[in-house]
Amino acid sequence: MKRKETYLSRDFRETAALRFPAQAKELNTAFDMRLSALLAENAGASKEKQYHLKRQILPGIAAYETLQRAMPKEEALQTVHGYVERLARTSHKQLAALLHIPGLYRLVPGVFVKSTRSVFGLAAGFAPKELQTGNGVWRVDMMKCPYHDTCAEYGCPELCRCFCDSDDISYTGLHPKLIWERSMTLGRGNDRCDFCMEVR
């Protein structure tokens, strides 16, 4: 069965074709083999965790490692950061456009409460500590995160910052009355991610 392409694998192939045409085939094969190995090693993870592993974490690791065959490590990191950033900017644009609907911004913290519980919960490898989830406020400390844990496990903790940054790009400045705040993240070396989205 053919594996579904993620935005990361698509962007990786584009980089290989445009920047390293002579090595593109070899790089694509190396990427596919590494991703297959990573998926096999993590096959026992829960369905909830697989959602994050398959969509972002493992393709990110495979792309980062494979790019280092053709460019310096720091450049490979910036390249993957660019992939993640591009998706985050698109997502920001779509969300901001949606929030032009009068009053819709008020619902955002509540949506974050629901999605944290369903997609970013214990079953997916996260450990959210809810501090405030009502009255237009979503305030959660994330004590454990599979993005951070998996990147660290595979020897590339620095890659996690790409995903941390993507949150800030996606959610900062969505609406004048909606405030996104986070001063710490596990991926940037802190002991938690202190998430907050509130209506002001």
Predicted regions located by residue number:
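N-terminal, charged low-complexity regulatory/assembly segments
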Residues: M1-L67
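Secondary-structure boundary/capping signal
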Residues: A24, E75, L178-I179
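Amphipathic interaction/junction segments at domain boundaries or subunit interfaces
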Residues: R55, T66-G155, L159
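C-terminal non-catalytic interaction appendages of large macromolecular assemblies
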Residues: G136-D141, P146-T150, Y154-R200
